[in-house]
C-alpha cells in the first residue's frame, strides 16, 4: 500500500454555517420539543400501567367469584337432586362421585382465589 497523496484527498464539502440562534431554532428546538413529548408520553404510560393491572386483577377476581358461585350452585343442585330422588335411601356411587367432583371444583376455585390475592399483594408492594 502506498500513502495517499494530499491531492488525492477529497476536498471537504462546504457547509453553511448558521448563526447560533438560527441553529438553535432550526435544529435543537424541534428535538427538544420531541423529547419533551416523549417524556410526557412515557410518564402518562407509566401512570396507566398500574391502573390497567388493577383492572385486570379486578376482572380476574370477579371471574373467580362467578366460578365459585357456580360451583356452589351446582353442588347445592346436585345435593337437592339426590335428596329429592331418594331421601332416606343409601347413597350410591354416582352421589359419591358427584360429591367428589363438587369438592374438587370448590378446591380449585379456592386455589384460584388465593392466587389472585397473592398477585394483588405482590402488585401492591
From Swiss-Prot:
Disulfide bonds: none annotated. Residues 94-124 form a coiled coil. It is found in: Nucleus; Cytoplasm, Perinuclear region. Found in a complex composed of MORF4L1, MRFAP1 and RB1. Interacts via its N-terminus with MORF4L1. Interacts with CSTB and MORF4L2. Pfam families: MRFAP1. The gene is Mrfap1. Keywords: Coiled coil, Cytoplasm, Nucleus. This is MORF4 family-associated protein 1. One of its GO terms (cellular component) is nucleus. Belongs to the MORF4 family-associated protein family. Its main location: nucleus. Transmembrane segments: none annotated. Residues 76-99 are annotated as: Disordered.
